[in-house]
Amino acid sequence: MSDVETFAFQAEINQLLSLIINTFYSNKEIFLRELISNSSDALDKIRFESLTDKSKLDGQPELFIHIIPDKANNTLTIIDSGIGMTKADLVNNLGTIARSGTKEFMEALAAGADVSMIGQFGVGFYSAYLVAEKVVVTTKHNDDEQYVWESQAGGSFTVTRDTSGENLGRGTKMVLYLKEDQLEYLEERRLKDLIKKHSEFISYPISLWVEKTIEKEISDDEEEEEKKDEEGKVEEVDEEKEKEEKKKKKVKEVSNEWSLVNKQKPIWMRKPEEITKEEYAAFYKSLTNDWEEHLAVKHFSVEGQLEFKAVLFVPKRAPFDLFDTKKKPNNIKLYVRRVFIMDNCDELIPEYLSFVKGIVDSEDLPLNISRETLQQNKILKVIRKNLVKKCVELFFEIAENKEDYNKFYEAFSKNLKLGIHEDSQNRAKFAELLRYHSTKSGDEMTSLKDYVTRMKEGQNDIYYITGESKKAVENSPFLEKLKKKGYEVLYMVDAIDEYSIGQLKEFEGKKLVSATKEGLKLDESEDEKKKQEELKEKFEGLCKVMKDVLGDKVEKVIVSDRVVDSPCCLVTGEYGWTANMERIMKAQALRDSSMAGYMSSKKTMEINPENSIMDELRKRADADKNDKSVKDLVLLLFETALLTSGFSLEEPNTFGNRIHRMLKLGLSIDEESGDADADMPALEDPEADAEGSKMEEVD
């Protein structure tokens, strides 16, 4: 061997290794899945390169994965004829945490980067140390000599040019020196089970070096000759008996051979009716590395002008980073005529369906397709359209089973709502899949379709209210009149509802109307209309006084027909943001604050003329327009209405002081001085009054 070079692991790798050795995975068996997966990636890469340059396969024309357990030396060896690694790859990728995965490789290749190994091993490689105390990696890349990497995970590793070992031709050989307590991974049965469990659907042959014992019948004198030599003496026996024994003599012969473990042809090439639920589950797990089974599967083929086969899975739970845009989703693998081309192919499926996993195998795409040409590819656009259509069908199939759909909806309702926001073609379909709690649904959730069937006679609109939580909206003042009249109101309490409902606008010809915005019109009898007019007249004076006190805090103050019990509420404009949307936008750290100016619409204060507080306030205001307590009460009512209507307070301290003053009044505590009122502006301000009158005229 030539000179040995020693390199220190990067600090994070050391941490990672101690993490892996101590806590990383409890089920150590996954190391084999990870290493086979790495081999499969390396084979994908060389196959991809060979599509444009056949000579790349000269070093080793066969593509395979070999596994050799050696009980004599307690080693497990994994050999693949993949792309291999150069010396630089070895140092970089097995010394620092590398970016694993075909995606970066494809992108770099498309960008004209050097096609030598780019990040073959991710964290998966280090999982070898779950079972091994020492790992030796021998590797040969087309562009470099053969090198050996070795480490006992003690903070450093060595790299040496391999002059003594066998020539690999091309590829990588990993020898794992197993720990004393991990020798089960040398057992043929255990290894076969593991490969079947995790790597059954790897598209390259995985062969295991197995012992085979065969019984041979020996009828000649060979056996006897051997015995004679060994014992040095011959027993005299009956001739006949000897002949008889010679005929029957059986001897066990032990030999080794390769045994192919993954005999299945790709699952998507088989007929759906032939495939069992267990086979789909095994395929899903090998595809996604999920430890749970899938929730639903759709296996179909499209024929005609365009041919492709696909298997799509919906997982049981959403990944914790579902909406993490920085992380590349590993969702749909793209094959062309059984040749793996790339994973996480963004162009195959819209972002809002990124939770759907699966594979697509096209007969029509060119084999040398790159990410750049993908975007312009017409075939891919048709495939994408078909996939979305099939996903929608799959969701409707899940919806037939209530229990399954509840699981699905809990995990992926945000995606459906995002679909409504982004996909105008399928908007109506997605709307059918929505489920909401409502004033009449109890603990169950209701669909828009069911809501429509329960609509009252003469009801033309679907009513909804948005808010922070079900608890927050259940007793909202906005619902009082609607409940009294027996209308059902949907609770939309997911932040994304604000966006999706902004796009949906209607369902089956019925307009979606917010209970918290202007323009809520409820059917009224002639008597009710007449009564309303009288009350408007009666309270006109109070409305003006309140507008003067509140100034530009509100656009106008009017007599309400939507509140029944509460004294008042604050309503937003029909096309502006609701209180809930305002809250959501304020919570966004990187928001564009210029937009808030014109989208957070002016509030209208609606007062309830039948509420005793309002009636008393009217009497006081009529008696003395400048009554100090009227002003205090109006401001207090406004601030309380802000809270009950879902807005946030601009000045919580002032509100607190007002409440404290009311408490003192209630407890008959005298104010010691007028200091407490000093911060309250005077009620009568001639300029403000004039301004207020102008506003009235505008209104």
From Swiss-Prot:
Compartments it resides in: Cytoplasm
Q: Does the keyword Chaperone apply?
A: yes
Q: Does the keyword Methyltransferase apply?
A: no
Q: Which UniProt keywords apply?
A: ATP-binding, Chaperone, Cytoplasm, Nucleotide-binding, Stress response
> What Gene3D superfamilies would the database entry show?
3.30.230.80, 3.40.50.11260, Heat shock protein 90, C-terminal domain, Histidine kinase-like ATPase, C-terminal domain
Segments of skewed composition (Acidic residues): 219-228, 672-690
| GO cellular component labels | cytosol; perinuclear region of cytoplasm; plasma membrane; protein-containing complex
The record's listing under SMART domains reads: HATPase_c
Could you state one GO biological process linked to this protein? cellular response to heat
The conditions that induce or repress this protein are given as: Heat treatment increases expression 3-fold in mature leaves. Has little effect on developing shoot apices.
Tissue expression notes: Most abundantly expressed in roots and apical shoots. Low expression in mature leaves.
Q: So where does ATP get bound?
A: 38, 80, 125, 371
PROSITE patterns associated with the record: HSP90
Annotated region (Disordered), positions in chain: 219-248, 672-699
Instruction: Using the UniProt record, give the first listed, main subcellular location.
Output: cytoplasm
Tell me where the sequence motif TPR repeat-binding sits in this chain: 695-699
Q: Its Gene Ontology molecular function terms?
A: ATP binding; ATP hydrolysis activity; ATP-dependent protein folding chaperone; unfolded protein binding
Q: Which family does it belong to?
A: Belongs to the heat shock protein 90 family.
**Free-text comment about domains:** The TPR repeat-binding motif mediates interaction with TPR repeat-containing proteins.
Q: Subunit structure, briefly? A: Homodimer.
Q: So what does this one do?
A: Molecular chaperone that promotes the maturation, structural maintenance and proper regulation of specific target proteins involved for instance in cell cycle control and signal transduction. Undergoes a functional cycle that is linked to its ATPase activity. This cycle probably induces conformational changes in the client proteins, thereby causing their activation. Interacts dynamically with various co-chaperones that modulate its substrate recognition, ATPase cycle and chaperone function.
| Protein's name in the database | Heat shock cognate protein 80
Annotated gene: HSC80
